[in-house]
Every structure is written in C-alpha cells, then in structure tokens.
C-alpha cells in the first residue's frame, strides 16, 4: 500500500489565471517515493478521473481571468470569503460553505468582491474516460 498525505505548506504555489495563488495538492502527477507503480494504479482507481485537487486563494478586488477547460469539469468548495462567479452567461454570488459546479468547455471566472481573502478547494475531474481508458 502507498500512503499519500500532502500538506499545502509543503507545496510551492503557482500563479493561477493571472490573479490567484494555487497550491496543487494532489494530481495524477503526485509522486510518493518514486513513480506511481502498477499496484498504486490498481488501488487508486478514483485518481484516474481526478486531474487535481488544489487550494486556491484570491485577494480582495481581484478576479481569475475568464477561461475554460476542454477536458475536465471542476468543483469549487468555498472555505472562506465571498464574491461572485460567472459560468457561461450566468452570474451567482457565493460565500463560505458553498459548492460550485463548473462544466467542461464552459467559460468561467471567479471574483473576490469581499474584504477578505477568498480561499477555496478546486477539484478537477475528467469527464468520460479520457484519462483512465476503458468503456
């Protein structure tokens, strides 16, 4: 068995969509003590559809630039803060505790219009069987 535990403090952040910070906590590229081997591949079937789990932060008055993902959908879980999200032509307010679903191939952007940092978990998942194969 291979145990994977990842703390955001041990991950280098990257700039996300020009305005936010993103800590990629888990992805298909996550390594433990080497490459993910055949045994791990068999045991972690759910990872075949997950492209990433990230901790994201967005400062007040900033927005992610509008973007879309051709090969995966996303779910955001809002940990802290408030703002609004635009998905396609629809706009909705959000606050801590909300879960937001974003379909693949759909233009979206998130805006922090509150006074504190927006912090959220972003889960990316392949639709269909693109990553894992099979039918």
Where do the PLM segments sit?
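Short acidic-glycine-tyrosine-enriched beta hairpin
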Residues: 89-104
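A short, N-terminal "cap"/entry segment at the start of jelly-roll beta-barrel domains
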Residues: 1-50, 133-135
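Conserved short histidine dyad/triad with adjacent acidic residue
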Residues: 35-42, 54-69
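A generic "binding-loop/recognition-motif" signal
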Residues: 60, 71, 90, 106-107, ...
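Ligand-binding loop in jelly-roll beta-barrel domains
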Residues: 104-130
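Histidine-centered metal-chelating micro-motifs
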Residues: 63-65, 84, 100, 104-110
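Short, conserved beta-strand element in jelly-roll/cupin
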Residues: 56-59, 68-85, 126
